[in-house]
Each structure stands twice: as structure tokens, then as C-alpha cells.
């Protein structure tokens, strides 16, 4: 299992713990580079101080001083310089912010990026159940009814195909609630921008080559 996949599983476990403990909103902000690497993948969990207290209490029972320490202890050592953890408080509400930066998804990661026929294809299967069906369990649906997922994706080029709720230029948004948030495959297909100035450089090289060829013929 790749380090990034382990980290993604950890992200989801934290999010799931919050969901099962009470109402919550989960936001994902993902930004992709034109070479297919991920510039940043940020997870923001917004919940109440009560739910946070339950999670912190669970962490202390496991021998950790805080929820932060509990989370950071699970991150592979080679990934620690690429991952940050922050908490932002506002009255009775808290935002848990976890971000990974500058990594290339492995083949077994939930986040998959590939180049195909001149396009860049992005998929995130983190929120797609294996059978892709909404649970019929009444208790499960009740627990998830207060859950919201907001996913924001920024691709390096214009998005030409996606299952997002909103698409504008190189950005896409998904806004999901309840059990449907865990039955969704995040998908987008974008153009791959050229290297700035590359076309101009080719034109200059072409003109120089033509000039040399013309000079030789004339000579």
C-alpha cells in the first residue's frame, strides 16, 4: 500500500468518525499540475466543539495528548514534511484542516490522474462505495442525513467533461448531501496546457532553419 493511500484512508477515517459522532460538513480542495502531480489536496472538516471533544477524548484514551498528535502519529515518516494539520476555532464550531502537498498518486491510490489522447483525466474514488449503491440501512441513512460534502477541483486546463454539479473553465464543484456523498465518483477531464512560450520558440526555430536553408540554396 502506498504512503499516499494510507494517508487518504486516514483522512477518511477522521471524517467518518466526525460523521458518526454528529452533523458535519466535509470540504475537499484539490489542485492538479499539468504534469499529473497533485499540487495540493486539502480536507476541511467543519463540526461542533461537542463532536470535537468526543474525538479528542478518544485520542486521549489511546494515549495521545491531543487529536492533532493522534493524527500526526499515523502519517508515514517520509510524508510528514508534505502534510500539515491545523485547527481553526470560531465560537462553538471548529474546522480541522488537513493538507497534503506536492505528490504523485500511486497506482493503488484513490486519487487517480492519467494522460489520455492529449487530455488529463482526474478521478477520486475516496467517496465511491464499492457497489456504488445508496445504503438501504435506515440507521446508516439517518446518521448520514446531516452530512454534506463539498468538493472543489482545479485542473491545469479547461475542463471538457465532468460529472460535477458546476463546471467553469478549469474548475469544477460537487455539492452532495447524505448517503449520496459516499456513492459518488469524482471525475473530470481537462485539456493539457502547453508550455508557456513553447509555441513561440518553435516558430523562431522554424524561421531560423528556413533562413539557413534559403541561404544555402542561394549560395
Curated annotation (Swiss-Prot):
Cell compartments where the protein resides: Cell membrane
Stretches that traverse the bilayer: 8-28, 194-214
Pfam families: PGF-CTERM
Protein's membrane topology: Multi-pass membrane protein
InterPro entries: PGF_CTERM
GO cellular component, one term: plasma membrane
Sorted UniProt keywords: Cell membrane, Membrane, Transmembrane, Transmembrane helix
Protein name in UniProt: Uncharacterized protein AF_1487
Organism: Archaeoglobus fulgidus (strain ATCC 49558 / DSM 4304 / JCM 9628 / NBRC 100126 / VC-16)
Taxonomic path: Archaea, Methanobacteriati, Methanobacteriota, Archaeoglobi, Archaeoglobales
